[in-house]
Amino acid sequence: AWSGVWSGTLDIYGGKGKVQSVGMEIEILKIDTSTQGRYTFSLIYGGRDKDYRPYELVPVDASKGLWRVDEKNTIVMESYLYGPKLLCWFVVEGSRILCSYEKTDDRTLIFEVVSGRETPVSVTGNTKTDKEDISEVKTFPVSVFQRAVLKRK
């Protein structure tokens, strides 16, 4: 089960290595009053008094792995539970962001974020040779990578 309070350190990396570390918790708790199977999905950075994000995790079609993260401020993002990973991929203010939450065992949850500008850094391919049509490939920059290994409290 994913339910529980998960705690650890979030490490933030750039091209030159680790740039910052901050304490992090994720609270995933069933909402007692919910008949829809909703859960709290709170992200806490540096303590509840510093950066507390009281989101909710809402099932849409759990049999197909479709959920939504409701930020409770009109932002609602589709998320996908595929195998051991919950994935959410979105664009905000020109940055493309992929968040993943991976339950590796009953006591460990790995949280990762990859982000970078939505503008490609290169476009290659898009040509023909004697033997094949080469598809166009756009490569996007990665500016920040974040990772936390969280343990169940």
Give short role names for the model-derived ranges.
Residues 1-5, 32, 100-104:
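N-terminal helix-cap/turn-to-beta initiation motif at the start of protein domains
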Residues 4-8, 37-39, 107-113:
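A short hydrophobic beta-strand element
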Residues 16-99:
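Central antiparallel beta-sheet cores of small beta-barrel/beta-sandwich binding domains
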